Amino acid sequence: ASDVYKRQHTPGETVYDRDCCITTDYLQALDTLGSGTQPFFSFLFYDLAHGIELSKDKLYRFKPTWEFADYMKLDNNIDPTPFLNLYYNCMAEVDSLAGCVLQKLAEKKLLDNTLVIITGDHGQEFNENHKNYWGHGSNYSPVQTHIPFLLYDPGKPSHTYRHVTTHYDFVPTLMTEVLGVTSPPSDYSMGHLLTDTCSRNWHVVGDYLDYAFIVDNHTILEKQPSGCIEISDSLLNPLEDYKIDTRKLNPEFKQTMQ
């Protein structure tokens, strides 16, 4: 096997260098992966969206901009624009690197029979809720839980869906529409088909320690370490008079624990 598949760390002094490295390595690997008839699975994780730093020569698309994420400057009153523009500049570089991969796939005619997914594992907050939250992993509001999800399927026409979906929906979609599984998604997943417009009420979001249920209009029912449930609206404002229908809550708890 290639040393690329054996290494535990990607070489490079900066986040950008390492993202460029995995792109270069993958473009070279495609010459082998795409040369035969065997199916292959590939995963590229671009870290610029997490590292949020670039050299000065890359900070030209969005201004004014910081050169790095200076978290010590952040508070509830600071103008987020320079920090947000730094993030935009980083994402523009990720977009460019992903474009190189797509171009290579096109050149090798692999887009004719390859599913391509571009997504993220979480959102990124820049104090949009005006409660001094920055980054991710600190609340379950839309700005931290909404993510892009682009699915390219060469066998289907382009379409934009505007109903609520979750990452849980991808596996049932893949199993049903690509792999030919006929069992209902409820047998193995909390998700639905991505094209299914049914309600996603009571879908689960979580981090390493806690979790929450998201219901109507992104109402957040967050389990606290004490076992209590804290209820807030999409802007993290407490909802004191919200009534929980335990007939709906209990089955969701049971499914989450399975």
Short names for language-model regions:
Residues 2-70, 191:
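Active-site-proximal alpha/beta segments of enzymes that process anionic O-linked groups
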Residues 17, 81-94, 137-145, 156-172, ...:
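A short beta-strand-to-alpha-helix junction
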Residues 20-35, 67-114:
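A long, amphipathic alpha-helix that forms part
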Residues 58, 106-154:
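Histidine-centered active-site microenvironments of extracellular/periplasmic hydrolases
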Residues 106-109, 153-258:
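Membrane-interface soluble catalytic domains
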